[in-house]
Curated annotation (Swiss-Prot):
Gene label: acsA
Post-translational modification: Acetylated. Deacetylation by the SIR2-homolog deacetylase activates the enzyme.
Binding site for ATP: 388-390, 412-417, 501, 516, 527
Assigned GO CC terms: cytosol
Known EC number: 6.2.1.1
Cited function: Catalyzes the conversion of acetate into acetyl-CoA (AcCoA), an essential intermediate at the junction of anabolic and catabolic pathways. AcsA undergoes a two-step reaction. In the first half reaction, AcsA combines acetate with ATP to form acetyl-adenylate (AcAMP) intermediate. In the second half reaction, it can then transfer the acetyl group from AcAMP to the sulfhydryl group of CoA, forming the product AcCoA.
Residue numbers carrying N6-acetyllysine: 610
Annotated protein name in UniProt: Acetyl-coenzyme A synthetase
Keywords carried by this UniProt record: Acetylation, ATP-binding, Ligase, Magnesium, Metal-binding, Nucleotide-binding
Annotated positions binding Mg(2+): 538, 540, 543
Amino acid sequence: MTDKQVYPVSPEVAERALVNKSQYEEMYRQSVEDPNTFWGEHGKRIDWIKPFTKVKNSTYDYNNLSIKWFEDGVLNASANCLDRHLEQRGDQTAIIFEGDDPSVSRNVTYRELYEETCKFANVLKDQGVKKGDVVTIYMPMIVETAVAMLACARIGAIHSVVFGGFSPEALAARIVNGKSRFVITADEGLRGGRAIPLKKNVDSALKHEDDAKVDKVIVVSRTGNDQVPWTEGRDLRYEDLMKNASAECQPEPMNAEDPLFMLYTSGSTGAPKGVLHTTGGYMVYASMTHQYVFDYHDGDVYWCTADFGWVTGHSYILYGPLANGAITLLFEGVPNYPDSSRMGQVVDKHKVNILYTAPTAIRALMAQGESCMDGTTRGSLKLLGSVGEPINPEAWEWYHRVIGNSKCPIVDTWWQTETGGILISPLPGAVDLKPGSATLPFFGVQPALVDNEGNILEGKTEGNLVILDSWPGQMRTIYGDHERFVQTYFSTYKGMYFTGDGARRDEDGYYWITGRVDDVLNVSGHRLGTAEVESALVAHDKVAEAAVVGYPHDIKGQGIYVYVTLVQGEEPSDELKKELVQWVRKEIGPIASPDVIQWAPGLPKTRSGKIMRRILRKIAANEHDQLGDTSTLADPGVVDELISSRAFK
């Protein structure tokens, strides 16, 4: 194996792993050669009210697009997360809640979660929620959010979770697009020691948008703030409604292809895009990927640091883990509050075995230095995961060495809101690891690299990442706009699902995600992935974070414009700029030499931590009057600072 450092599967990991290398190869072969047999068998991993007899019925034919899995089966997602476990593990912890305040935590058993879910399902029915209705959930990371999602699933309502950091405008757009008449929120959320005015934002959203026809707003008391505005007749207190609700509620029988939830992806421009996931295939896929990718064994304590407002929170805090009877940790706070040792403290406090987090969080801790883990042992950890964007090798190595004590394999998972679950990732007992590579496809997933004309490229190469055939967790449509679904994902390369990402494949068949295709630079006719240049910059010991975009260049077509955030204590200078240019030349080659370096106090990020390169491209091109939708920015002030300090006016 090449491509720099390789971490072979250790004997200890291999011994306890669910799948070894030869098993992975055989299972993968069957999954693509005979998907009906493979998924027919693995579809039985969840409980069916009426078993399916049909497995896969899908075609990527552009004129006849159809994606259906287990289509004659009947099931209920909440029953698969709760009821099926009551006999064997009713008294086992289902959710460990860790509050924003480190002194606040509690364990919720499967039986308690079942009873709360049934009660709230009855509350929703009493308020007029019916099967097929869209319920908007705008909540903090608390147990009641999990209850709300599961209660919707129990009665066949479609939940639409909107991240609690989104603005009233963004919330309003999602309520209107989903034709949602019911909103569940909290008086306030707590995050990093600050109160987030959720109820106030809901009120603003409903005033802001004339088309928002909301009948009921159910409000959970999180902070007990009695100053929140109240609209009699519309607003209802969660606690009052739950007092007399019955703890028995029969799960609604759902066809496998009935919708389970929708989740809006920001899309760089245009109307919100409501990604719709259905019940059967999604549950099979979320549960199976959770078990195999994280090598989950009974009793493991599993912590995914995502938010319910993102697909990672849906698939890998809630549905996947609970379907598997797992112990899942629900974290209200942020990794650096009250200080940067919090992540290590939570791991030690709850004896976390599996940690799944984002490169953004890892790089933020890296910038603080290794001392951020002082006073914590993290000795319980046996597996680490990464999600959200490609992880640069330097962050991978730091994560492995500092957080994982050099003993935990890292599963670098590549997937999307649209895919429902992980598509490319190592299985820890089967695949040797290369820092920065998502490695190999999961069962049933057939990735390919194509050129701009759609020709499939073989062997060691680089191109546009497509998937050649359907898998059970795949989205079925964009809510209310099937034509946009077909156009967005299936029109670029006919007969293939286009991911929008670029990738390279090395001589071992490993996939390396190079970033969104619009994040590929064409410098003097050479293709350069921005992730590659960013990786090189972040490898420099004075650089905390870097973002790379193209800008119009008279000679090269595109020049390389770099935004650099320095490590605490380092000072910007012209000498350091020259040093960084030489560093990149050394790491990648002269073709990758940055043309412009701008010092950045921070980078514009969405609330899920993704860098908004679209905005950085506009600033670099001096088009800051055309920034487009900035409602998803975590800190809009960063943009103003970058515009005022732009490297050339």
